[in-house]
Amino acid sequence: MKAKPSHPAFSMSTSLRVSPSIHGYHFDTASRKKAVGNIFENIDQEALQRLFRNSGDKKAEERAKIIFAIDQDLEEKTRALMALKKRTKDKLFQFLKLRKYSIKVH
């Protein structure tokens, strides 16, 4: 009986290889959607709120308002969204800490 090879990568077929450029083939990127700077460019505020709400976001309206604020530049929007995320995380920690102390007291 022959032992099986210890390196299965050598017996891999050409159809399972990751890079098509080995054989001179190229990925077809012409049909891909072009990247945009603002991913929320073609969406209205209500649809964005619905998207956030459906994903379980408790502050969907506030988050959508931050994104659609016209007077803020990109850095201000990023800071506002990060602050909103931090406040949510802080409230969670406060809740967990309060729960921990209430269990010890009783």
From Swiss-Prot:
Kindly state one GO CC term assigned in the UniProt record: nuclear speck
For this protein, what is any one GO molecular function term?
A: Notch binding
**Where does it primarily localize?**
cytoplasm
Q: Which BP terms does GO give this entry?
A: apoptotic process; cellular response to heat; endothelial cell activation involved in immune response; negative regulation of apoptotic process; negative regulation of Notch signaling pathway; positive regulation of non-canonical NF-kappaB signal transduction; positive regulation of protein kinase A signaling; regulation of cell cycle G1/S phase transition
Compartments in which it is found: Cytoplasm; Nucleus, Nucleolus; Nucleus speckle; Nucleus
InterPro entries attached to this UniProt entry? Avpi1/C8orf4_dom (IPR020282), Tcim (IPR039580)
Keyword line: Apoptosis, Cytoplasm, Nucleus
Q: Could you give the subunit structure recorded for this chain?
A: Monomer. Interacts with NOTCH2 (via ANK repeats), the interaction inhibits the nuclear translocation of NOTCH2 N2ICD. Interacts (C-terminus) with CBY1 (C-terminus), TCIM competes with CTNNB1 for the interaction with CBY1.
Cross-referenced PANTHER family: TRANSCRIPTIONAL AND IMMUNE RESPONSE REGULATOR
Which function does this protein serve?
Seems to be involved in the regulation of cell growth an differentiation, may play different and opposite roles depending on the tissue or cell type. May enhance the WNT-CTNNB1 pathway by relieving antagonistic activity of CBY1. Enhances the proliferation of follicular dendritic cells. Plays a role in the mitogen-activated MAPK2/3 signaling pathway, positively regulates G1-to-S-phase transition of the cell cycle. In endothelial cells, enhances key inflammatory mediators and inflammatory response through the modulation of NF-kappaB transcriptional regulatory activity.
Name of the protein described by the UniProt record: Transcriptional and immune response regulator
Natural source organism: Bos taurus (Bovine)
Q: What is the lineage of its organism?
A: Eukaryota, Metazoa, Chordata, Craniata, Vertebrata
